[in-house]
């Protein structure tokens, strides 16, 4: 991410800053507490088996500079942003960031062949443009926002893969 601050994240999510500096820059989003470093926003997702909020202390210990959380407990100097739903907030942040960029993005979806189609389109476009594309097969509700985290102002065109596991998810991803 480029030129994103805690204040931008507050605007994107309509969240509440519980503590920390709103002018702090954010360089990356991560849902993995083991990958947190300075200027990284840890996004704890509540899954079917695990509520990743339990990893907040580990994320802070590993240098986590800022957190997005659904719970109201906040301590220390790291910014905590309270939002109703962390997955939705991550998608809102990705949409906010994507809207700051002016490049066209091609979306690829379907039942079979998304990755191959995306790779073929990107390969052809790379002959003329600096292409931004889905990393691996990160095409989910979590993966697309994490992919957009790597978008830069140097990219000229994007090719993103979008997958779904529930009704309505392609609309959500397309809106990002």
What name fits each language-model region?
Residues 1-92:
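N-terminal leader/targeting and accessory segments in enzymes
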Residues 10, 90-176:
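Phosphate-binding loop of NTP-binding sites
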């Amino acid at each position: 991410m480029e030129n994103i601050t805690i204040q931008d994240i507050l605007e994107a999510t309509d969240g509440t800053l519980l503590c920390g500096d709103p002018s702090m820059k954010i360089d990356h989003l991560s849902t993995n507490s083991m990958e947190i470093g300075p200027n990284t926003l840890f996004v704890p997702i509540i899954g079917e088996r695990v509520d990743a909020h339990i990893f907040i202390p580990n994320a802070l210990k590993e240098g986590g500079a800022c957190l997005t959380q659904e719970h109201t407990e906040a301590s220390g100097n790291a910014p905590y942003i309270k939002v109703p739903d962390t997955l939705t907030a991550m998608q809102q942040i990705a949409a906010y960031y994507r809207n700051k960029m002016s490049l066209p993005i091609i979306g690829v979806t379907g039942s079979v062949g998304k990755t191959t189609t995306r790779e073929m389109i990107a390969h052809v476009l790379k002959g003329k443009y600096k292409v931004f594309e889905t990393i691996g097969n990160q095409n989910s509700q979590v993966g697309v926002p994490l992919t957009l985290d790597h978008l830069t102002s140097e990219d000229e065109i994007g090719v993103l893969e979008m997958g779904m596991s529930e009704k309505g998810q392609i609309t959500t991803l397309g809106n990002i």
